[in-house]
């Protein structure tokens, strides 16, 4: 679900207008209800995650050594360790541009707060970004060469989290 302006925009000043207040509250109520009913999490693109959670901060990758993809084509070695988590924030971040401070979303809204982060990347990501994610213990996997292959990403999530996984 999503709140949009009449012209299809998903971000902008319209979200702060009094006329939109009821719609945005319904949006957040639905999100909290989905979480309470056992939704596996939520998926957002890089721009939304940046605007809502990372604030545009980006790590200095010069401090990191490139990580080789040793665990196969699609996921890092410890991806399966997240399967016990109850709720996920799945970031479609093709080029690896999000600057997370930890591996958990810290947000006052219970519909988002406490979600474990999983990064969905493409193979064009800087291998130093993988080292950054591993330092933060953020799980990631690859779903596409230059663009995210959404059906593949959803299949990987279901295969590694739960066959009943839904967002």
Feature map (PLM): residue ranges:
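Active-site ligand-binding patch in enzyme domains
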Residues: 2-6, 12-156
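A contiguous pocket-lining binding segment that forms or flanks enzyme active sites
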Residues: 157-167
């Amino acid at each position: 679900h999503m709140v949009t302006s009449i012209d299809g925009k998903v971000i902008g000043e319209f979200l702060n207008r009094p006329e939109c207040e009821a719609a945005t509250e319904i949006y957040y109520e639905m999100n909290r209800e989905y979480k309470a009913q056992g939704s596996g999490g939520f998926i957002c693109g890089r721009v939304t995650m940046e605007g809502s959670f990372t604030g545009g901060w980006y790590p200095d990758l010069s401090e990191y050594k490139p990580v080789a993809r040793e665990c196969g084509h699609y996921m890092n070695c410890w991806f399966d360790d997240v399967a016990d988590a109850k709720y996920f924030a799945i970031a479609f971040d093709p080029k690896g541009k999000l600057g997370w401070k930890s591996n958990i979303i810290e947000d006052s809204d219970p519909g988002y707060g406490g979600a474990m982060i999983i990064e969905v990347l493409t193979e064009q990501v800087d291998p130093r970004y993988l080292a950054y994610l591993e330092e933060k213990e953020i799980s990631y996997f690859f779903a596409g060469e230059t663009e995210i292959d959404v059906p593949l990403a959803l299949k990987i999530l279901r295969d590694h989290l739960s066959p009943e996984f839904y967002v």
